[in-house]
Amino acid sequence: MNNFLKHNDWARDPAFNHFWRHYDFSNQWIKQHTDASRQVQMQMVQRDNLSTEQCFSDSEEPEVIERLSRCEIYSEIENEESDIEEMSEEMKAFFAKTQEHRQKLKEQRAAEKRKEGQSSSKSQEEYVNVDKISIRGRIEQSTDHRNASAEFIAKREKAKKDYGESATKILAMESTLAMKFESEYSQNPQLWPNIPFRF
């Protein structure tokens, strides 16, 4: 395993630490499981005073044969040297590309955070009492020039996209409702409370 890490720089990247911890944990589990299986087998053999071959060849249980074959496989794996084959060029390119994408995404998120920080510091809103807020909401003072025709065109395009053919009807109903509100509001109605409290 150490040879593999020596020859592959990408594998030592901190992004893969979780993977290597999991890999080590899995190897430890396999070794412990193999040791426990061997101990159980040895106890069975000693108890019956038979060799392992006789013990398992006499039994006709397929489970026992399967367990023995698994234990042999684990012991073979354990006995072999832990030299892992070199990675193919495609795999190396894949990991390099993945790391590059992660780095770009990290930089993009950092830039967005910086941008949000700058915009929030610019637009520190002042506290406004409720009685100072008009019926149309809070009107913010801005030095930016408002392009009403561009806003109207954008609103119309959005309505076409959202409502399809009936977009013109819906925009007309919105305009009618806004005009009725303005005509009522121009008469200075009592806004609150609109019903008398008589207890």
From Swiss-Prot:
This is Uncharacterized protein F10E9.5. Residues 98-127 are annotated as: Disordered. One of its GO terms (biological process) is spliceosomal snRNP assembly. Pfam families: GEMIN8. Residues 98-117 have a biased composition (Basic and acidic residues). It comes from the Eukaryota. One of its GO terms (cellular component) is SMN complex. Residues 72-116 form a coiled coil. The keyword Cell membrane does not apply. InterPro entries: GEMIN8. Keywords: Coiled coil. The keyword Coiled coil applies.
